[in-house]
Amino acid sequence: MSLNSLDLPGKPEDTRVVVAMSGGVDSSVVAGILKREGYDVVGVTLQLYDHGAAVHRAGSCCAGQDIEDARRVSESLGIPHYVLDYEARFREAVIDPFANSYVSGETPIPCVSCNQTVKFADLLQTARDLGADALATGHYIRSRANGAHRALYRPVDTDRDQSYFLFATTQEQIDYLRFPLGHLPKAQVREIAEELGLTVAKKQDSQDICFVPQGKYSDIISRLKPEAANPGDIVHIDGRTLGRHDGIVHYTVGQRRGIGVATGEALYVVHLDAANARVIVGPREALETHKVFLRDVNWLGDTPIADLPKSGMEVFAKVRSTRPPRPAVLRHADGQTWVELVDGESGIAPGQACVLYSDDSNAARVFGGGFIGRSEREPQAEEMLRRLMANADKASAA
């Protein structure tokens, strides 16, 4: 049997596709394209949160005006549209873990958690319950057949590449998902929106952290976890106490501006000692990292990760969404998975993702990745930090 444009057997009119509609231009264009091609399209929007500042600010997602925009687009396309109340689930699976992670001194990525749980687990099951053959989204990433399964690849428009936030997508989910925008540049997507007469054609893109009003994540964390605003010491990696801070929630590893101390030297946040409410600072070279140990690894390569050779596997690693993939070696032994960064990286923090690719091109395959549990710096900085933390532990035990 021949395959349709979604690589599914059967004619488009016999193929039901649920489209995850956020109310933005990308997911609206996905619904419009599929409807134009003759598919049986059903729009679904998740109501994830509903607090005043986010509902009314421009660029939010999955609340207030966005839900209304998705409804209007669906009506103009002539497709059924459903709104599902996932507020409690979103808080449980995304917002609370986000706050907990920050309190523990990590730098979390809530978009990954949202994709991993709410969007690609709960919503996917809803799509199946609706009898859909596939769930389509407006993410900028590509998938195509790879033997009996499908594999993920970076999109044509690398400026919009969302593969970093999708590394935790499981093989089962990948096989069911479709990403119709992966082969299109953003400018063309907006042109298609104009052609389709969509009311959201000129709507601005949503923010990375959709549930944080005005981008001030410290406000929501302080409200959910007041201890994150507890004051503490700002300590140099060499052991000197330089000043005080008003909560580790206001700091992140790699930060230079707004540290709150003036010593005449360029200082960066190199570690957040959450247990002792300390912000550890030091020179830029103390941030240099060459090895990261991963947890919650989602491996999408063809060879089982446990079967990697002792010499490791040459890959390209991305440790921040805004940075390009860089040469690295992936290793796995004794139940541990780690990545050795050939050129080193600065500002790596626990809680961030390390995403793995076949190369650094826009056609690179996504091999999955994991969350950074810990990292190793240059030997001198690593020893100084180890000594500083050990002294704090002794003081706490005394």
From Swiss-Prot:
Assigned EC number: 2.8.1.13
GO MF annotation, one: tRNA-uridine 2-sulfurtransferase activity
Keywords: ATP-binding, Cytoplasm, Disulfide bond, Nucleotide-binding, RNA-binding, Transferase, tRNA processing, tRNA-binding
Binding site for ATP: A20, M21, S22, G23, G24, V25, D26, S27, L46, G138
Name assigned to this protein: tRNA-specific 2-thiouridylase MnmA
Family of this protein: Belongs to the MnmA/TRMU family.
Described function: Catalyzes the 2-thiolation of uridine at the wobble position (U34) of tRNA, leading to the formation of s(2)U34.
Site residues by UniProt (Interaction with tRNA): H139, Q352
